[in-house]
Amino acid sequence: RDSSLTSPHIHLSLGTTATLGDLADRMGNGGMVGIGFHVKQRTGLYWGVQANWGFGHRLREQGVLANLLTPAGDLIDNEGQVAFVSITGRTGLFTADVGWLWDGLGPNPNSGILLKAGAGSFHHRLHFENTEKRITQLEQPQLQYYDRLTWGVAGRLTLGYFHMSNDGLRNFFADLSLTRATTWPQ
């Protein structure tokens, strides 16, 4: 199409995340999935909401389960056997976004460079995966003392490319985002 359109859209996203600052002391890089609803106005204004969930962040923090280990460094399950526990980080980011689309790069005025800013909430915690026997200390209500749940406010800046094809069948976006959050233990 050769004219600028108002276009509401639901989108799914998939990507990777890199941790920095204090969060990098606790967990490493991981994956990310998300869903959002945004509206691109004729004028270039772009606004909406987005939810992202991070998973698979490698644990970096030492001594998370230190008080549950035997003198030999083993974790014992409810049956008295050595337990094998995988610990990863999980995150959640929920934002309301506003931005601007500069057209001129793409097949029509609905494609171009997209700059947006968002504000919302961010949380992160540790996830314990035990595929063997139960470990009572890593179940509710005790789990809350080990999962290191923190929650707080976040801001996000995103720069990317938004593409809307002429036939409406190949719409996509690619971007880089920088998120800054301040969180508190829960």
Where are the model-predicted features located?
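Residues that define the transmembrane beta-barrel architecture of outer-membrane proteins
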Residues: T6, M27-V33, T88-F94, S111, ...
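Short loop/turn motifs that connect adjacent beta-strands in outer-membrane beta-barrel proteins
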Residues: R1-P8, T43-G44, G104-G112, M164-F172
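Residues on the lipid-exposed face of transmembrane beta-strands in outer-membrane beta-barrel proteins
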Residues: L12, T16, I35-V39, A51-W53, ...
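Gram-negative (and chloroplast) outer-membrane scaffold detector with strong preference
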Residues: L45, N52-L59, V64-E132
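Flexible, solvent-exposed coil segments and beta strand-coil junctions
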Residues: H11-A18, P71-Q81, K133-Q142
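Extracellular loop and loop/strand-boundary signature of outer-membrane beta-barrel proteins
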Residues: T19-L23, G80-V85, Q140-D147, Q186
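Outer-membrane beta-barrel transmembrane domain signature
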Residues: N110-Q186
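Short glycine/proline- and aromatic-enriched beta-strand/turn motifs that initiate or cap beta-hairpins
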Residues: R1-Y46, Q50
